[in-house]
A protein has these predicted regions:
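Residue-identity detector for glycine
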Residues: 8-14, 31
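Cationic, low-complexity basic patches in intrinsically disordered or flexible, solvent-exposed regions
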Residues: 25-29
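Active-site entrance/lid segments in N-terminal catalytic domains of soluble metabolic enzymes
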Residues: 34-251
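Thr-Gly-centered strand-to-loop micro-motif
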Residues: 54, 73, 180, 258-259, ...
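Conserved active-site-proximal phosphate/metal-binding subdomains
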Residues: 116-132, 234-257, 263-413
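Residue-level detector of alpha-helix initiation sites
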Residues: 184, 262-263
């Protein structure tokens, strides 16, 4: 069974060299076609192995897709022009394999309902108390806070109109999935997906959210437990995945991708044993050679334990899991903290602050390292080295196969 699974998801016989069934496998090798796993996600996305990799780095996206998984590019940080360049690069480097994009269109945001909100108009709303608190914090660590000039018409962070423009750019490329987080996708997004025959996925952190997404017409649910990096809820993946699957089953058959803390093929197999159709992953790719993260942050990831990945409002204004640092302690624990501002105002503060922190750390400011942080899940405790994205995909496949073999052995006659 182990060799058969490995062959189906890797197309390689060599991985099974230690199996007791090796002789039989050799006899069957001739004429055997490479097969994909039996998962609705594989069928919907045209992939070999239902491992989805969210990343802001185009190199990771392309490498994962080439290796048989499915790369998903985080598009929210881009303008339409920069996204066009990124997608063109992916098209040229993905070897014809499928990939997707992810956007953020929050339902609950402090500027909801307001028109023509720009980055500069939001800057004017940031209280002086919060500006001074940030500047004083960085000064304690010999970091000069520098600001980035923005255009008068630059949209606010997490702007819905901009997100839809990004989708229009994306549909000029052969994307196979669009995903949204922080709420039900706008009706226009779902309609665009149907028009282009591209599945729409939505991230959820609670059963109630999943029911709303199913009613709205999404094609795939990414059920994300609290272990996940970035914005997340309070229910664990182990509880949330079966809870959602049970709740939506009488309504409509919507494939579920498990997310939150999944760093290994064994964890992926466990989630699929609960009924998930595959896995959505993020943090594991931050420790790859292709990742956009700095060498300093990778070193901090390797040194971290799972308890160092905490939920904090200090970066975006919403609870988001990230690596604990002097920054998170200052906003969440310090008695003189003014408290995080609501989304998107806190992002106005944190963007320039973290740009300044990262520059100082890269320039050799040893004290600045204490403030270096990024979004990462509790699975960070499982990271012990930096590897290539392709090697990580291969490890997922091998560990998945071993986990399935282990379970089969438990019930073997």
């Amino acid at each position: 069974m182990l060799a058969q699974i490995r062959r189906g998801i890797t197309g390689s016989e060599g991985l099974a060299s230690n199996s007791p069934r090796k002789a039989k496998q050799e006899e069957q090798r001739e004429g055997r076609r490479e097969r994909t796993m039996k998962s609705p996600i594989c069928d919907m996305l045209g992939i070999e192995f239902p491992l989805l990799a969210f990343s802001h780095c185009r190199d990771v996206v392309a490498a994962v897709s080439r290796a048989g998984g499915f790369g998903v590019l985080g598009a929210t940080v881009h303008t339409p022009a920069t996204l066009e360049r990124e997608l063109k690069w992916i098209d040229d480097h993905v070897d014809g394999k499928p990939y997707g994009i992810d956007v953020l269109i929050p339902e609950n945001i402090s500027t909801a309902g307001e028109k023509d909100v720009t980055w500069k108009s939001l800057e004017a709303r940031v209280p002086q108390e919060h500006r001074k608190y940030t500047s004083d914090l960085l000064k304690k660590y010999d970091i000069e806070l520098t600001t980035t000039e923005v255009a008068d018409n630059q949209p606010q962070p997490f702007d819905a109109k901009t997100a839809l423009e990004l989708l229009k750019v994306s549909f000029n490329h052969p994307i196979r999935l669009i995903a949204n987080a922080l709420g039900v996708p706008p009706k226009a997004m779902i309609e665009m997906g149907k028009k282009h025959n591209v599945p729409v996925a939505a991230l959820v952190g609670a059963k109630e959210h999943a029911l709303r997404q199913v009613a709205a017409g999404v094609d795939i649910l990414v059920v994300q437990g609290t272990e996940a990096g970035g914005h997340c809820g309070e229910v664990s993946t182990l509880v949330l995945v079966p809870e959602v699957i049970k709740a939506i089953k009488p309504i409509r058959n919507v494939p579920v991708l498990a997310a939150g803390g999944i760093m290994t093929g064994r964890q992926m197999a466990a989630c699929m044993a609960m009924g998930a159709a595959g896995a959505w992953t993020g943090s594991v790719w931050l420790a790859t050679v292709e990742s956009e993260t700095s060498e300093i942050f990778r070193e901090k990831m390797i040194a971290a334990s799972s308890r160092d990945a905490i939920r904090s409002k200090g970066r975006t204004g919403k609870p988001a899991r990230q690596l604990r640092s002097v920054w998170t302690d200052a906003w969440d624990r310090a008695p003189d903290s003014p408290g995080a501002l609501p989304m998107p105002l806190q992002s106005i503060i944190s963007r320039d602050a973290f740009n300044s922190i990262d520059r100082a750390a890269a320039a050799g400011n040893a004290r600045a390292r204490d403030l270096v942080s990024y979004f990462v899940g509790q699975g960070v405790g499982l990271i012990d080295s930096v590897k290539s994205a392709g090697a990580v995909v291969q490890e997922f496949k091998e560990e998945f196969a071993e986990a399935v073999e282990h379970m089969n052995a438990l019930v073997a006659e």
